[in-house]
A protein has these predicted regions:
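Transmembrane beta-strands of outer-membrane beta-barrel proteins
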Residues: 110-118, 165-169, 203-207, 260-266, ...
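Outer-membrane beta-barrel "beta-signal"
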Residues: 464-476
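Outer membrane beta-barrel transmembrane domains
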Residues: 275-293, 302-304, 321-337, 341, ...
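Outer membrane beta-barrel
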Residues: 142-274, 377-417
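N-terminal periplasmic/intermembrane-space "pro-region" immediately following the signal or transit peptide
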Residues: 2-8, 24, 29, 34-119, ...
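Outer-membrane beta-barrel architecture
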Residues: 100-102, 152-154, 193-195, 253-255, ...
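Long, well-ordered hydrophobic secondary-structure segments characteristic of membrane-embedded
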Residues: 83, 90-193
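Short loop/turn motifs that connect adjacent beta-strands in outer-membrane beta-barrel proteins
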Residues: 89, 95-112, 124-125, 154-167, ...
């Protein structure tokens, strides 16, 4: 019987839209994005897919556009570079500048931030018509869909004469209570990379071991992981082999920044195996293996316009791209494809501002479309609309409220191949999720959410689920 599930993960990435403060790297879990159904990411074309249920992911703070005074400016100058949206600033951590830890490390050119997140979800209706078999989708019963802990460290290579260069390291532990759908438990190297900017940041490149989930696409609602994996949850990029948070591969990226906030970015990575994280971890538990049999080269290209919020200037981020993977994937109707590919487009726009001193505060709308060929990708189309507010409550400038609606369209060939004889199926899954990321104190975020998921699994035909979501995230 087919199984289903969703997941977190981003899946994640240079702080502009919403002038967002750091994404909580929770995305580490990702991400991109509630992100996509992990189960889908972890299965090849010949395997049963998971249900496409969205799940909010670790919360991440929306930072102020204002510079943080005092020693924090020194700490933040050592923050990890090269993401589409940055990690939280050091002032938005539980440790802050206490105990002299950051001072001592900064004196040596070292920056660091720690992060941990736990997310659960549950279908309040419990309306599966008396079904007594194994769990098929997230929230069918109380599900801990992600628990992550990560440490990020950087070293300023200017200390040894490499101006504007940075060495980046991260390690991650990830686990969940539903491995069959949400992916394997793992402890892995997350990043081991060299970043360099040239010509006053007109050119940026990064090479080493890292994931592209937070380097492209921009799958965090409001540009912030803190509020973020509630939005763009499309799994299409991951289905075709793009690496995502917690599952890095050898990668090289280059970004060129033109005038008027226009940019283009190109990435080359070793593909994840067909099936995603499960075969990746089975063959590469440490995360340091350069090549895995059966994987090819994946390239991704993106062009965009990323206008940051300024007093009187509304934020707008438009991006579009394509992915090509030389890896062979099983086709649903037999045989193998010689490659795989996907396309995407996404737009986010600030409708109005509510605080001239913090221009990122205000109301935003956005949308995302993903497509991949249905011959070998079970989710072939993904559509999303979102509306979200940053600091809408006067006394709550760091909070993020969001409503995200999406539709996942299944491959017709895939449904034929994966639906058990005598059972019906659904051709798509729809969901609407509302959530509020509440900053309890600097470095600590609490994110409750509620959502309706129509067709939580493609087969058998279960009724609409009404899920509660709860995520607690903290930064050290």
């Amino acid at each position: 019987m087919p199984h289903a599930g969703i997941s977190f993960h981003a899946r994640r990435h240079r702080g502009r839209l919403c002038a967002s403060s750091g994404l909580a790297m929770l995305a580490l879990s990702c991400v991109a994005a509630p992100a996509v159904a992990q189960s889908q990411r972890d299965q090849s074309a010949s395997e049963a897919p998971a249900a496409v249920q969205p799940t909010p992911s670790p919360v991440l703070p929306v930072q102020s556009a204002n510079a943080t005074p005092g020693p924090y400016q020194t700490y933040d100058a050592l923050a990890m570079r090269g993401w589409e949206r940055p990690l939280p600033k050091s002032g938005d951590t539980l440790l802050g500048d206490k105990l002299g830890v950051r001072d001592a490390l900064a004196d040596a050119g070292i920056g660091f931030i720690g992060f941990a997140s736990n997310a659960i979800q549950y279908n309040f209706l419990q309306n599966d018509g008396g079904y007594k078999g194994r769990q098929l989708y997230n929230a069918q019963k109380l599900t801990r869909n992600v628990s992550n802990a990560a440490i990020f460290a950087t070293y300023d290579l200017g200390r040894i004469g490499i101006t504007n260069g940075q060495f980046i390291f991260s390690a991650l532990y990830t686990s969940n209570s539903f491995n069959r759908v949400d992916g394997p438990n793992a402890t892995r190297i997350g990043r081991l990379a060299y970043y360099q900017s040239l010509f006053n940041k007109k050119v940026e490149f990064k090479i080493g071991y890292f994931d592209n989930g937070f380097e492209f696409l921009g799958t965090q609602t409001g540009g912030s992981l803190a509020g973020g994996t509630l939005g763009p949850q499309a799994s299409v990029p991951n289905e075709v082999g793009l690496s995502y948070s917690g599952f890095s591969t050898p990668t090289a990226n280059i970004r060129i920044n033109f005038k008027n906030h226009v940019y283009t970015k190109l990435g080359i990575q070793r593909s994840l195996p067909p099936g995603g994280a499960t075969p990746e971890v089975a063959a590469n538990s440490s995360g340091l293996r350069f090549h895995i049999p059966g994987t090819g080269l994946l390239t991704i290209g993106e062009v965009g316009w990323d206008q940051p919020a300024k007093p009187g200037t509304l934020a707008t981020w438009v991006r579009a791209g394509g992915i090509y993977n030389s890896t062979n994937f099983n086709r649903f109707q037999g045989g193998q494809s010689k490659d795989n590919w996907a396309t995407y487009i996404a737009v986010d726009h600030q409708l109005f501002q509510i605080d001239d001193s913090k221009a990122n505060r205000g109301l935003y709308v956005g949308g995302t479309v993903n497509y991949a060929p249905p011959q070998q990708n079970f989710i072939s189309q993904y559509y999303e609309g979102r509306i979200y507010g940053v600091g809408l409550v006067k006394s709550r400038p760091f909070d993020l409220a969001s409503i995200v609606a999406n539709a996942n369209i299944y491959s017709k060939q895939g449904l034929v191949a994966r639906t058990a004889a005598g059972q019906g199926n659904f051709k798509q899954t729809y969901s609407v999720i509302a959530s509020y990321a509440y900053r309890l104190t600097p470095g600590l975020y609490f994110q409750p959410g509620i959502g309706a998921v129509v067709h939580p699994i493609y087969s058998p035909r279960f009724d609409t689920a009404v899920n509660g979501y709860l995520t607690l995230t903290f930064f050290i």
